[in-house]
Amino acid sequence: MLRMSGLILTLVLVTAAYEQDESEPLSPRTARFSASSPSDVARCLNGALQVGCSAFACLDNSTCNTDGMHEICRSFLHGAAKFDTQGKTFVKESLKCIANGITSKVFLTIRRCSSFQKMISEVQEECYSKLDLCSVAQSNPEAMGEVAQVPSQFPNRYYSTLLQSLLTCDEDTVEQVRAGLVSRLEPEMGVLFQLLQTKACPPSAAGGTGPVGAGGSWRWPMGPPMFKIQPNLRSRDPTHLFAKKRSTSS
């Protein structure tokens, strides 16, 4: 019933590459904007239109590694015609909600990169939840699958936030997103993930001990990802990387 192994491995590149321990000290060069950057970014956001992607273009021009939202915005606008009426409204209102949220909080967080990046992700997730992303995805699975494509700058935290929000949806919607991701991977990687997807779920997943959100839906764990993938015991190759057994008594 659970088909999590392929989905988890499809998303590992998204989350594992950018997650940072908040307690990790940041160097002055990477932790803060240059002397003129805070006012430039804030002025750009305050002068940007409340519709469209102009506000997110301001984030691409920062020196705090906040790229990603602009590309997500353009993907939504490019695919808006494929959504139904509810979906079109969601595209318009979600982009406006995120842009307004970021603009209203920019002065509180912009001087420290980690705070600024986290604020953008939180606003993004709040707007998706408020405007019922899952309901839109359920009625527009193909259109949403096209929007949730691997971005040119990969990985990035805002693309991951979009995927994590979609993972709280029903199983059919999650499968649609997963299939769309795999279809856009390089052929070799796509084959690898398809093969790994056919493996049985780890005992912990089968026993229902994996991370479960409200209403029984699966949710991507926010801590460091851990994977326990085992091949079929009868066909185990003792020399294979994945065939190494965990020592229990020796």
UniProtKB/Swiss-Prot annotation:
The organism's place on the tree of life at top rank: Eukaryota
Q: Which GO terms describe its biological process?
A: intracellular calcium ion homeostasis
- Give the family from UniProt: Belongs to the stanniocalcin family.
Recite the lineage of the species.
Eukaryota, Metazoa, Chordata, Craniata, Vertebrata
Quaternary form? Homodimer; disulfide-linked.
Output this protein's name. Answer: Stanniocalcin
Query: Which of this chain's residues carry glycans?
Result: N61
Give the stretches traversing the membrane: none
What residues make up the propeptide removed on maturation?
A: 18-32
Keywords of this protein's UniProt record, alphabetized? Disulfide bond, Glycoprotein, Hormone, Signal
Q: Which PANTHER family match?
A: STANNIOCALCIN
Range of residues in the leader sequence: 1-17
An example Pfam family from this entry, by short name, is Stanniocalcin
Disulfide pairs here are C44-C58, C53-C73, C64-C113, C97-C127, C134-C169
Summary of the function given for this chain in its UniProt record: Its primary function is the prevention of hypercalcemia. Upon release into the circulation, it lowers calcium transport by the gills, thereby reducing its rate of influx from the environment into the extracellular compartment. STC also stimulates phosphate reabsorption by renal proximal tubules. The consequence of this action is increased levels of plasma phosphate, which combines with excess calcium and promotes its disposal into bone and scales.
Question: According to its UniProt record, in which tissues is this protein expressed?
Answer: Corpuscles of Stannius.
Identify one Gene Ontology CC term for this UniProt entry: extracellular space
Keyword Transcription in annotation: no
Q: Where is this region: Disordered?
A: 228-250
Which Gene Ontology molecular-function terms are recorded? hormone activity
